[in-house]
């Protein structure tokens, strides 16, 4: 459907089936989904339709007499109380049984739209301010699609062509009054469906992939032979009407829907969902066999970054498809800890860790694995009562204590740093848009105890809202400015002599300039490849005329542009980036990165993709095996030859 107009164009012609790629939504939708009113008593909706024949594409296309047209009475012992839920069920079932003629719904719409002039559809706003913490810059807009519904009702179809499932733009699909015995698993590809009518067929079971249709609001299955429902239907958290009358449904499920309605049944299936088999381990992709070898003399360092999804953000309104026990912090934190321990990374950067979880769980647990930590909460924690401040999330960075010495630690509050700039005076947007956001970055400066190499490690979390792409860009610019200042300061740090336990360490390195110090910049940047924030980091400069600034006033950053001196690359750019780092029903894209300075470091191995077959039945994270809506990034690096003066190590008094 395009917009909210009462009547839409009805297209009688259907183009030949061909592969059609899925086009992402212009911007991530909000995870907040209010409980809507129950569905209308009528299923004669107005929308764009195509009802052309599928004879050439569908096997056994044989229009014929209707099947399963009669009402089936089962489970007479169940009290079918005439409450509002069951009244609506019976009314919709009666309407469905009257819709047995070929293309009934398409013809109905055609009659209703005769003589009505169609107003041009309004383009969707590209700056949608509503949403949750994981929104981001707009995706590429989808080409205009003139129709969004197909009506193959009353055609006597015995099978469905695979080509049908390439029409991923479909929002409504009518397959009622046919002779279908099964529904192909490929139905899970039609993830934009809001209405699916399979009434009056001979279907005995639904595939698990039905759970992928998380946009469904109406699923009509009247007069089939369905005895049970897959637990994956618990993912259908937007479903308002499940039409199940006329099926020999088992007593437990039927009792649920009769007494409490569709949403209660979906909730029951979700909460009773058994633990699925875990996916295969993500591949360890070796990019440099020589450097990654355990026998290699080169200095290696591993880095992991993960947005852990803090407890306060993991609400049922945001993640309605996730069982409550899986969404609980007690369950998810154990999964996170298990993954951190399994990778045993030298450096760990976590975002969205609240103070209570850092102090009361991760710092203590990871200490058993030789980790020391540095943590700062976001700015809002200042001024709060101690107990209240525990729920404020922030950034936690851990490092192996036996391998590194902590030389310095800093916190960058983007908003506060911006208002302290000399050029901030009179720049309203700094105060009205940027200062109000309390996002931060944590910076630590480390020295390798054995080699003397030093590293700057940045752990950042940027603002999410796609309507504030200028804010994300300026946050990135301020981050790069502050790292530049710190790196120059760190280049002048004296050699570390407090290494008595490692008297045979190599000589310390004195770096000639800040951009010669190896730098890792990890985090959730809430910015996709190609965005302004991404381009600033990757290319080192961005002009003052960039459209993402929208001519807003940010001092010299919007007057003369933005630059930084570092030669930064995304670790995963070596494989063309992952398919996604954030995975939910409405949004899949890349938000998280491990950036590194390519003049000082070389990426030698990476943790690969989540198994694609596993994802065919999983509409979104978190779930039983992935504790956050973000996936962890993990990479191995080698340190390139050091540049700068070498200062001899202090080995203490020597005996003759």
Curated annotation (Swiss-Prot):
Compartments, as annotated in UniProt: Cytoplasm; Nucleus
Composition bias type Polar residues, residue spans: 116-131
Reactions performed catalytically: Exonucleolytic cleavage of poly(A) to 5'-AMP
Enzyme class: hydrolase
GO biological process: DNA replication; DNA replication checkpoint signaling; nuclear-transcribed mRNA poly(A) tail shortening; positive regulation of transcription elongation by RNA polymerase II; transcription elongation by RNA polymerase II; traversing start control point of mitotic cell cycle
Basic residues biased stretches: 22-38
SMART domains: LRR_TYP
Keywords carried by this UniProt record: Activator, Cytoplasm, Exonuclease, Hydrolase, Leucine-rich repeat, Magnesium, Metal-binding, Nuclease, Nucleus, Repeat, Repressor, RNA-binding, Transcription, Transcription regulation
Its EC number(s): 3.1.13.4
Cofactors named for this entry: Mg(2+)
Single GO term (MF): poly(A)-specific ribonuclease activity
Renumbered residue ranges of the record's region Disordered: 18-42, 116-141
Binding site for Mg(2+): 352
LRR repeats: 169-190, 192-213, 215-236, 238-259
Gene Ontology CC annotation, any one: Cdc73/Paf1 complex
Described function: Acts as a catalytic component of the CCR4-NOT core complex, which in the nucleus seems to be a general transcription factor, and in the cytoplasm the major mRNA deadenylase involved in mRNA turnover. Ccr4 has 3'-5' RNase activity with a strong preference for polyadenylated substrates and also low exonuclease activity towards single-stranded DNA.
Similarity annotation: Belongs to the CCR4/nocturin family.
Protein name: CCR4-Not complex 3'-5'-exoribonuclease subunit Ccr4
UniProt organism field: Aspergillus niger (strain ATCC MYA-4892 / CBS 513.88 / FGSC A1513)
Name of encoding gene: ccr4
